[in-house]
Amino acid sequence: MSEWISVKDRLPKLNQEILGYEKDIVYWGFYSQFGFLDTLEECERKETTHWMFIPNPPKEVV
C-alpha cells in the first residue's frame, strides 16, 4: 500500500499521476512544471503538503 510522502521529502516525477493532500482535501491529480494540478477540478493546488502514488486496483473479488 502506498504511504503519504511529504513534499519536503520528495516530489513526484513530472506529469506523474498522484493523489494529493491539501487542507483536509484529497484530490486526484498530477505534478507538472507549474506544480500540483487537480485533474477533476482543473485547477492548481498551491498548498499541497503530501502526495502518494496511485494505488493498484483491487484484485478480483471472488
Where are these regions (language model features)?
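Secondary-structure transition motif
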Residues: M1-V62
